[in-house]
């Protein structure tokens, strides 16, 4: 069955291959491109980025026209493939909080009637944006370079995830009364461009790395200090995020009668959406393997074994996500843990390799 995926960081390497394979399988894909300020002016959040050499519909509130980002040419090329009509491209720079907020509102607006998210569900979000500046030895690295690793590989993906998860709350019209204002002016009605239903995320995937494992410390990875530290911090952050999601979903689950009432009063609400009482999100961390990408194309001081292509990595990871993600036969790794005589904590994030093997935190 066709699904809706959101790939954050899709202009090259793993993210681009995710987008390509998902489109070929007939899925709907929302993909993001990060653009330097000097090559892309910020568009209206309600407008997707334009196709190459195409002038978008002008934003009546802004005279500025977004330009085609040259660093995303391979991503834009996918719009010309047989299923390219299923691709929506938005702007997001995970190292910039304003960009993250603008991107989140762009996603929210895709939930309005006629938008690709009008069903109120994103089946899978893949937070893939990342950076590797080599060498990144802790004993030699600059403050700026270390901070860049943390902002791009850790803080950005987690904050982006947090903002996207906030979409599970419906956007309500302004309150009809306010204790802080004596104005008698009527309340501004909800804009028809704003969605009235929440958007549920079923599975959230973070692209992690074996370098971030604190159990299997890889001391031979000279020059990976900053990168490894950023991935280790990402792992801890996403584990806490999963625990927080689980606690919140348990504390606010409405009664069955309340859920039925909501569905009756809002027929557009999906039965498995957050508002109907099932806002569980499965959180996964994935090590994609030693993938031959532009980011990994650096001269290392050690031999990397088992290098695989992006095509192989993504093909395998799609299988892992299908099995371990929301509704999978091994959702959250519960079944595989039981087979090993272990108990998987409910709602916990789990860490997997592209081969579907459990990896230690």
Stretches found by the model and what they are:
Residues 94-120:
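Conserved Rossmann-fold cofactor-binding substructure of NAD(P)-dependent oxidoreductases
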Residues 156-161, 203, 317:
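Conserved internal alpha-helix within the Rossmann fold of NAD(P)-dependent oxidoreductases
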Residues 25-71:
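Conserved glycine-rich Rossmann-like NAD(P)H-binding loop of the short-chain dehydrogenase/reductase
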Residues 130-131, 137-150, 155, 166-176, ...:
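Catalytic loop of short-chain dehydrogenase/reductase
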Residues 79-98:
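Rossmann-fold cofactor-recognition segment
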Residues 11, 15-21:
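N-terminal Rossmann NAD(P)H-binding glycine-rich loop of SDR-like oxidoreductase domains
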Residues 8, 118-130, 153, 205-208, ...:
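Rossmann-fold scaffold of SDR-type NAD(P)-dependent oxidoreductases
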Residues 272-273, 277-280, 285-286, 291-293, ...:
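C-terminal helical subdomain
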């Amino acid at each position: 069955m066709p699904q809706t995926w959101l790939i954050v960081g899709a202009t090259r390497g793993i993210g681009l291959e995710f987008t390509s394979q998902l489109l070929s399988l007939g899925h709907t894909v929302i993909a993001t491109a990060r653009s330097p300020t000097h090559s892309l002016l910020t568009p209206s959040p309600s407008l997707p980025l334009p196709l190459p050499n195409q002038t978008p519909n002008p934003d009546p509130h802004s005279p500025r026209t977004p330009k085609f980002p040259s660093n995303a040419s391979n991503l834009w090329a996918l719009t010309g493939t047989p299923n390219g009509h299923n691709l929506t491209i938005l702007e997001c720079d995970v190292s910039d909080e304003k960009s993250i907020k603008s991107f989140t509102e762009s996603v929210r607006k895709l939930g309005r009637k006629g938008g690709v998210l009008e069903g109120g569900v994103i089946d899978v979000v893949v937070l893939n944006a990342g950076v590797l500046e080599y060498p990144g030895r802790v004993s030699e690295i600059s403050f700026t370079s270390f901070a860049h690793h943390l902002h791009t590989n850790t803080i950005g993906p987690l904050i982006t995830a947090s903002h996207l998860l906030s979409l599970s709350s419906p956007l309500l019209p302004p309150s009809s009364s306010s204790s802080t204002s004596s104005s008698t002016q009527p309340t501004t009605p909800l804009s028809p461009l704003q969605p009235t239903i929440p958007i549920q995320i079923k599975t959230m995937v973070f692209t992690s790395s074996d370098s971030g494992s604190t159990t299997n410390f890889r001391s031979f990875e000279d020059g990976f200090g900053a990168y490894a530290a950023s991935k280790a911090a990402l792992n801890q952050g996403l584990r806490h995020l999963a625990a927080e999601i689980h606690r919140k979903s348990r504390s606010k689950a409405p009664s069955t009668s309340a859920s039925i009432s909501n569905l009756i009063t809002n027929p557009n609400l999906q039965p498995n959406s957050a508002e109907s009482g099932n806002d569980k999100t499965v959180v996964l961390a994935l090590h994609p393997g030693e993938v031959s990408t532009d980011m990994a194309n650096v001269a290392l001081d050690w031999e990397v074994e088992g290098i695989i292509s992006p095509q192989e990595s993504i093909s395998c990871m799609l299988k892992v996500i299908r099995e371990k993600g929301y509704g999978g036969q091994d959702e959250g790794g519960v079944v595989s843990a039981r087979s090993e005589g272990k108990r998987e904590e409910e709602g916990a994030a789990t860490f997997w390799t592209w081969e579907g093997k459990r990896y230690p935190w």
